[in-house]
């Protein structure tokens, strides 16, 4: 099978992605290789990107960065990156040049814009339509957020809008825009500007929060007291507190009283919970905030009453009815590390709440990781050996951190392991599969669990109630997509559906991922395609030594060492002619 097949590991946690029926269909494009160089063809087999590049793909970022890159924004997969002579550029799927082959490194696409760094080490921005946002070159930039990017020239910061308008870099520090306003520092004091650079709030404060949230911005006056202003600069909540949370969440913020205890206020400054907590550990989420009391950690309501105690080292906000919790040990060791890159200052709960190893934070440092100065430092770093768990809004344990490992919660449940065995619980905490399996691969899209028992045999379980769909008698089982599964018996592969029905006997040398309802299988006479019912989709006179899954009605096939394209009837759209092929 074509080399882009992913290999599954026993402990892997798979989250299936679904393409919405409302999403526009992208033009078919395949990368092709000829005489050692890459280009691209369309669905008719016509060359749309010249075959003259060293590399070509949807993303040429490092492998561990490609997922974030390709999911950075809607429409990202309509762009193809090419490289020649160490420089890169972008094309559309139809072959239109978006960014010329000119940059050495880049950011990810955000809000239809991309930051690129050229050979001169200066940074500029392009739009997806290929236009240059500004001809000014910057030393450091952020991604665009809410229509504005922070830019640095020399030692000062400014802003650039998507339409190329610049707020001149005159500020000592700058923070992101939110609702058309941003906090900036000039002459040692903080104020608030609009998107034209006009001051809405004069620079009179010693510090501010990261950005407006729910119409409020935290500010610190010359007496080192904190309060909040509204969008007009009015001190709705006059500075009177030693510390406050950086932003409101669900209409509430945390405040530190004279007693060195924390309480809650609403957006008008009314105290809803008098100072009583040793720390506030999370912003409000789904009506609850993680807090530290004299009796331990728990979750509190806006009025300060404790919903339930949660005796864990770390608490996290709720999401879809579940909150992550963690327990862990702390140790300090020396490591060699790169210094962080940030424009302005970081801002997070840890500055106030003295919960030093809490990973939850409202981070506002900015800058592209590609702009590292290349300097290493030896420094002591605190390492936390953590174990994750999940609880619901009553405090019920859904997945205990006492397990050796609890994986990130999925839409239907949670994978966990203990003593070298794997299990699965649903989001109510019911064990669907107890921790008795030596391997477990959740397939949430098809609602099944691929499980391996202590005899090294694989079976298929229902994700709904754990009942056995396929018996534990197979050397291997693979999820093939489209509700189909491959099972291996006596060295050959057969096909089954998600109900456990065997659609074919074990006849095939290999199987691969289904594409558009057609399943590639390998016989002694090469690769063929099956229908969902397990029948041959079409006969073909040629022997396919390799194939790709179908995409947009076409599949790649390799015949006598060359790649071509066929449609779903087996007809050649592009006869085999290329050294390599990759459907994008």
Show the residue positions of the predicted features.
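Sec/Tat signal peptide C-region and signal peptidase I cleavage site
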Residues: 17-21
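Residue-level detector of conserved, function-critical positions
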Residues: 22-584
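Bacterial N-terminal signal peptides
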Residues: 8-16
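Positively charged n-region of N-terminal signal peptides that target proteins for export
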Residues: 1-5
């Amino acid at each position: 099978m074509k080399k882009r097949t992913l290999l599954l590991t026993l402990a892997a946690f798979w989250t299936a992605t679904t393409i919405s029926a409302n999403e526009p269909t992208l033009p078919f494009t395949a990368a092709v290789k000829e005489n050692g160089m890459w280009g691209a063809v369309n669905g008719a087999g016509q060359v749309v990107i010249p075959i003259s590049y060293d590399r070509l793909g949807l993303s040429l970022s490092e492998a561990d960065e490609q997922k974030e890159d390709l999911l950075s924004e809607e429409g990202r997969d309509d762009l193809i990156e090419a490289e020649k002579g160490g420089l890169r550029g972008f094309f559309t799927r139809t072959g239109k040049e978006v960014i010329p082959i000119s940059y050495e490194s880049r950011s990810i696409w955000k809000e239809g814009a991309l930051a690129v760094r050229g050979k001169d080490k200066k940074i500029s921005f392009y739009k997806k339509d290929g236009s240059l946002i500004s001809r000014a070159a910057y030393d450091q930039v952020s991604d665009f957020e809410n229509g504005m990017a922070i830019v640095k020239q020399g030692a000062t910061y400014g802003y650039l809008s998507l339409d190329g308008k610049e707020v001149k870099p005159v500020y000592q520090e700058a923070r992101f825009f939110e609702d058309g306003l941003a906090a900036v520092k000039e002459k040692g004091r903080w104020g608030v500007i609009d998107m034209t650079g006009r001051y809405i709030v004069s620079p009179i404060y010693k510090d501010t929060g990261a950005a407006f949230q729910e119409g409020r911005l935290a500010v610190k006056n010359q007496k080192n007291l904190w309060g909040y202003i509204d969008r007009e600069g009015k001190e709705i909540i006059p500075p009177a507190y030693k510390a406050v949370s950086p932003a409101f969440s669900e209409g509430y913020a945390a405040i530190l009283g004279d007693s060195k205890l924390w309480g809650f206020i609403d957006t008008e400054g009314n105290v809803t919970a008098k100072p009583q907590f040793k720390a506030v550990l999370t912003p409000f989420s789904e009506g609850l905030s993680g807090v530290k009391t004299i009796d331990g950690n728990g979750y509190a309501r806006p009025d300060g009453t404790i919903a339930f105690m949660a005796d864990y080292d770390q608490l996290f906000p709720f999401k879809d009815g579940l909150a992550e919790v963690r327990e862990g040990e702390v140790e300090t060791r020396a490591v060699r590390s790169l210094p962080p890159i940030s424009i302005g200052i970081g801002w997070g709960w840890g500055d106030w709440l003295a919960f030093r190893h809490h990973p939850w934070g409202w981070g506002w440092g900015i800058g592209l990781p590609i702009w590292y100065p290349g300097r290493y430092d030896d420094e002591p770093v605190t390492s936390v050996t953590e174990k994750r768990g999940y609880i619901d809004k009553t405090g019920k344990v859904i997945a205990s951190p006492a397990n050796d490992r609890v994986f990130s919660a999925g839409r239907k449940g949670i994978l966990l392991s203990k003593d070298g065995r794997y299990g699965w619980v649903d989001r109510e905490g019911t064990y669907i599969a107890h921790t008795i399996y030596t391997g477990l691969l959740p397939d949430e899209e098809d609602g099944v669990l691929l499980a391996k028992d202590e005899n090294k045999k694989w079976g298929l379980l229902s994700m709904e109630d754990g009942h056995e769909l396929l018996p534990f008698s197979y050397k291997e089982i693979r999820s093939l997509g489209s509700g189909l599964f491959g099972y291996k018996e006596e060295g050959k592969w057969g096909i089954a559906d998600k109900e456990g029905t065997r659609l074919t006997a074990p006849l095939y040398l290999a199987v691969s991922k289904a594409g558009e309802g057609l399943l590639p299988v390998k016989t002694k006479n090469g690769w063929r395609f099956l229908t969902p019912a397990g029948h041959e989709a079409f006969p073909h006179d040629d022997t396919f030594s390799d194939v790709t899954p179908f995409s947009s009605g076409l599949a790649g096939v390799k015949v006598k060492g060359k790649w071509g394209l066929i449609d779903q009837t087996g007809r050649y759209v592009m006869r085999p002619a290329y050294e390599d092929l990759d459907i994008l």
